[in-house]
Amino acid sequence: MQYERTLSTVWDDLLESLDSETRDLLDVLAFLNPDCISEDLLRGKPDTTSGNLTVNNSFRLTVMLSSLIRRNLLERNITTTCPSLRMHRLLQLTLLLNLDRRQEKRQEAFDNAVRLTRDALPRRDMTSRLPQFDAIWKQHMPQVLSLQAAFEQSNLSIAAGFEFASLLADAGSFLWEHRLNRIAIPLLTLGEKIVVAQLQEGETHSVLASIENFLAVLSAYDSVEDRRLAMQRLKRVVQLREGILRSLPDKTATLEQQIDLGRAWNDLAYIHADTEEFEEADQGTAKALELYKSLGDERSLRFRFAIQYQSIAAVRFGQGRLTEALDLSRRSYELCKSELGPRHLETARMEVEWSYVLIGAGDLHGALDRLMDALAVRSERLERDNPAILNTKYWIGTVYHYLDQLEEAEEYLRQAIEFGADSDLGKPDLARSQYRLALLLYEQRRWKEAVTFEEAALSSISDEEQATIFCDGDGRDKRKDITMEVLDRRVFLQNGRSTGPFRGERTGKV
């Protein structure tokens, strides 16, 4: 209490000198990221900050901001590329503490902050990915995270509805595309909680289906056990999507609503492919493709066909139908590149997944070219410890290992594990990379170091699985192969596999 009183004393005189409109604006800003509030965000749609402030009265907004800057309640960022403001964190805390004592004002300010942010951010359309919106999402993502924190940390509950949940769902989608899973999952979990609280028993809503879908896919990276839960969640998503379409009058479903159902079928099918249930995977991917063909073609729905071809390619790869898998992977990459351009993250993902099939076909140099291209794109767009970059480096190191270029292989494999558990790289992926490096070190007779990495990798699997390896493995080399296959199968299929049904026609090292 003494701390709160001290903070209030610092700012009270200045706050009391503000007119009501300017104070309302400051309360809204308190829910946003204090380090960088874009002025473009404030000049959004009419009536988003108070009853009198509108985009048509830009001059009035300028006057209010000037007043706040003059009183040192805000300051301009001079280092940012676009006009933005900064608020002292102690002032932000004071404003939020004051709002916690004024429930009606707090709710109004929060709703307006949500509306400002929602209006500034383009809605994520799963029909395609529009690359021109990426910069906008990246610029304003801190505001979404600030709203999430304010909502969760408020002393009193804040009401939130579908608009905020939809914003969280879209943010989760963007973060997943950038493989920022640790940030995305709490956002989506909060969105799910908000939507469920709004729905009556038996009710469905598209926002809930979207959130469930993203949570299922995100959780699939963590462990085999989580992928089993993801399969159950995706079955619910299919039911939700089918229920939404059934509830609509005939021929009134939008293109996106129908595509959302196809996505749900496809994502569930992909999890079946991950667990090597290829018959179910084949049925689900075919069902989604048939739906897309009824809605458009490769020209009108290029992105969705690209995604679908890549999913079917993974199934064909696992079925041993390599010629089909290679053709589908190539078409997937080309469609994605023509839709989004060669430097988009989704294009890079299609290129990496194409490389998995090339490895299975024994075209190691072709795979290496694809992986190097994708690494260049990902390194340009993502941080060094991003799991997409680390996974690409694992595969580059693995291809070099297959080519007996051990020095290059070691370099990339060490880079793949250098951040360890501190990155978003899933535990199964880290263990696989550690064991691949151990195999390389064993080849070089660097026993002590090899054992260290081998033990680290084996610590990620259960005693029962380790016992199975030693029972089935007749001889040291056989045990190494079985261990690599066990660790490889624990990795989510989207991150690639090179053993079991996904070994393909390649011969030589496991």
Task: Annotate the PLM regions.
Residues 1-2, 43:
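Amphipathic helix/helix-loop-helix segment enriched in hydrophobic residues with interspersed Lys/Arg
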Residues 11-103, 107-122:
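C-terminal boundary/linker of central alpha/beta nucleotide-binding cores
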Residues 20-21, 28, 111-190, 194:
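Extended alpha-helical scaffolding segments used for macromolecular assembly and cargo binding
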Residues 166-177, 206-223, 256-274, 300-318, ...:
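Conserved alpha-helical positions within TPR/SEL1-like repeat arrays
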